[in-house]
Design a protein with these regions (language model features):
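FAD-binding beta-loop-beta segment adjacent to the flavin cofactor pocket
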Residues: 95-106, 110-137, 142
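Acidic-aromatic/histidine active-site loop/patch
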Residues: 155
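Generic alpha-helical structural context detector
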Residues: 68-71, 124-128, 160
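Short, flexible coil/turn micro-motifs enriched in small/turn-prone residues
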Residues: 63, 142-144
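A helicase ATPase "motif cassette" and its flanking acidic/Ser/Thr-rich regulatory loops
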Residues: 151
Length: 166
């Protein structure tokens, strides 16, 4: 939510927010090319947590057909966005990465799958930062920065409308 206010005695015409933008990108466009570092892949507990339909009902939802999203809170602090994908050959050789069963709704039923959290770069991409934006902090802080940031295209549209207004 953005609030913009002006003094009535200085700016008499009403401010008009920018029109809604049509979303034109698929979520996969924000992902890094495979492979991503193994540290982003989940073990058994994490995989079961993100694929359990009963637990999914309690999560916050933002376009749930695309990606599962969890909000940070003081009790749990499990934070981030997750992806379930088909395993690559090297995943079978890494004991830390859990390979579970998941139905991708592609007609194949339950098949091998791995879960992973999005990388900080992917989270920044999702917020509209391009790849020239340098992430100079550790992953934990980068996730928080991405979560607390303003979506870049929205900010650009607001600034453009404000410069036209003023």
């Amino acid at each position: 939510m953005f609030l913009i206010g002006f003094r009535d005695d200085i700016y008499t015409k009403p401010y008009k927010f920018p029109e809604k933008m049509e979303l034109t990108h698929a979520s996969t466009e924000y992902l890094e090319p495979s492979p991503v570092d193994d540290i982003y892949y989940l073990g058994k507990k994490g995989f079961e947590w993100i694929t359990d339909p009963k637990k999914n009902l309690r999560r916050s939802r933002v376009n749930q057909d695309i990606i599962g999203c969890e909000t940070a809170n003081q009790q749990d602090n499990w934070i981030g966005d997750f992806r379930v994908e088909h395993p690559q050959p090297w995943h079978y050789n890494d004991d830390r990465i859990y390979i579970g069963q998941f139905d991708f709704n592609d007609g194949n039923g339950l098949v091998d799958a791995v879960g992973r959290k999005m990388t900080p770069r992917e989270c920044m991409n999702l917020m509209g930062f391009d790849n020239t934006f340098n992430i100079v902090v550790n992953d934990s802080i980068a996730y928080r920065h991405a979560g607390n940031s303003i979506v870049v295209p929205v900010l650009k549209a607001l600034i453009q409308s404000l410069t036209e207004y003023l």
